[in-house]
Amino acid sequence: MKIEFVTTHAHQTVTFAGEELCSYLQRMLCREEGRFSVSLAVEPREGNDAFRVETGPSGGTITGSNPRSVLLGVYDYLHHLGCRFLTPMPQTEVVPEIPRDRLPARYEKQASFRHRGVCIEGANAAQNVLDFIRWLPKAGFNSFFLQFRLPYTFLARWYHHMENPLREPEAYTLADAEVHTALFERELQKRSLLLHKVGHGWTAEVLGSSAMGGWNAVEETVAAENLDMAALVDGKRGFFQGVPTNTSLCFSNPRTVDTFAERVVSYARRNPHVDCLHVWLADGFNNICECASCQKTTVSDQYVQLLNEIDRRLTAEGLGTKLVFLLYQELLWPPIRARLRSPDRFVLMFAPITRTFERSYDLSEVRSSIPEYVRNRITLPTSLGENLAFLRSWQARYDGDGFVFDYPLGRAHYGDFGYLHIARIIGQDIKKLRQMGLNGYLSCQELRACSPNMLPDYVMGALLFEENADVEERITEYLEAAYPGRTRLARDYLERLSELEVCDYLNGKGPRVDPDMARKLSAAAGLCEQMEQQLDSVPDTPHWKALRHHNRCIAHLARAMEALASGDREAALRLHRQLREYICRMEPEFQGWLDVYRLLDVTWNYTGFRAC
């Protein structure tokens, strides 16, 4: 069959959408005769991404509210015809052959939320990032966040092969990261995906340092001419615990505000293609300036005053850059007096990094008040109700656009060995966003959160586009496509693993010696060992091969964690070494499925093997 598209809208994303449609349909209709012609059109309108599909046996139209929506409509139509985009890895796509009579369709959709995206974390080869960007619109997402000025630290971790002594480190420089970042941004622009940038690093730059080392400590000290802009903590000014990214500033110093604001405005001036520019303060907590002038107010009041100054300067230059401000660590406490003067300039980002992932948000648990703020003596909230109380306190002072920046696939997911629990938590959370007064979700996560599969992200993308979608139907759809023929075997195994989830324990919450936890982990390891022989007889397809690898990985991890929870530190360390040896040895074969660096980093530093 001859497949073609026509359009009168000269936009690279619309043209790309047509090329994608033709490429996939050519494969799907390879045995059919005749012609199929689709017209791609843009009918601009305000609001969330929306598209309309109207096709018959010989062709039709796909219309979007913007160029990106045309592309989203194309991928949704392909999904309607039976395609399944299960992971960012092209070899995992399901592209069925279909008869011509399957082509007719008539429906329209509008995204439930404005903000639907992912933020880079973990360790990534450039190809991992490119594959992920190319997958985003196939899964219904519209945004991608490249942290820092350059995502150098997330790329260098891979090329330096951190945590894997079996691989020789490769050279990787800031210049390499610049080349790769330009490539990433071209791919995002090709798809009209919203680009989020920076976030971390501003405070380090104000002090004349670079944040390109991520969260690593440095030997350098703050230059004498900049020392007065560093926070005074415990009677000293300098890099907080040696880490520039974690160093707060003295915001009562006018030079600090001037320098910070000028850096943001200069960046916005030179990068007009950035859709959402994140303006964050230092990472870490209990690191706020204790000088007499700063103690007259709160850091959140100072933050809002800084944002207002940046807004004033952007407005003076005619720059319409959207600024994202952060509710995180000390900034969970709202300002007492200061208010944003131009709310439409800003987007609120709620980042409950210390929340539990054992259960979803319960809006009936929201507390009526928040704890008193005590400078550099805060304890971060862990309960969902307390986290939501902080959000409500901010929303009483700001009623503009906002989204949640959440972490289910940052650390806690490694404790859900079957990925069904965390997928359901994500789905339940998204269904509550509207009640929470939020217009979307950015997931701060490893891009290779794909062991045993990519089900959590698949559910995330689907629910963010259609909040009323049935989570269980999406789970079934995914598992049937990933494990055809013996879906029941895979599902039963993954369900049983998820019943034994230990998300909070793996993430460092609760006592490290816990007999009940040890019994649960013993059961998980035993289940993996029982299943090993059955999994050796399954088809040799990508998802089944990955599930076999995952089975062996979890058997090692669960046994190591069982020893840790039993208080046997010597055995825990020995078994963790066995886990390390196995996943490092297997990394070349399963690089796209498991972020070896991140799993080892999290279990060492958060689960507690470092202390053994």
Pin down the residues of each PLM region.
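Aromatic-lined carbohydrate-binding surfaces of glycoside hydrolases
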Residues: 9-15, 29, 47, 112-398, ...
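Generic structural signal for residues positioned in beta-strands
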Residues: 4, 37, 52, 61, ...
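Short, solvent-exposed alpha-helical surface patches in well-structured domains
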Residues: 72, 258-259, 489
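Catalytic domains of carbohydrate-active enzymes that cleave complex glycans
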Residues: 437, 462-612
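Short, hydrophobic/amphipathic alpha-helical patches that form generic packing surfaces
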Residues: 19-24, 68-83, 138, 454-466, ...
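Contiguous, structured surface segment used for ligand recognition
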Residues: 1-113
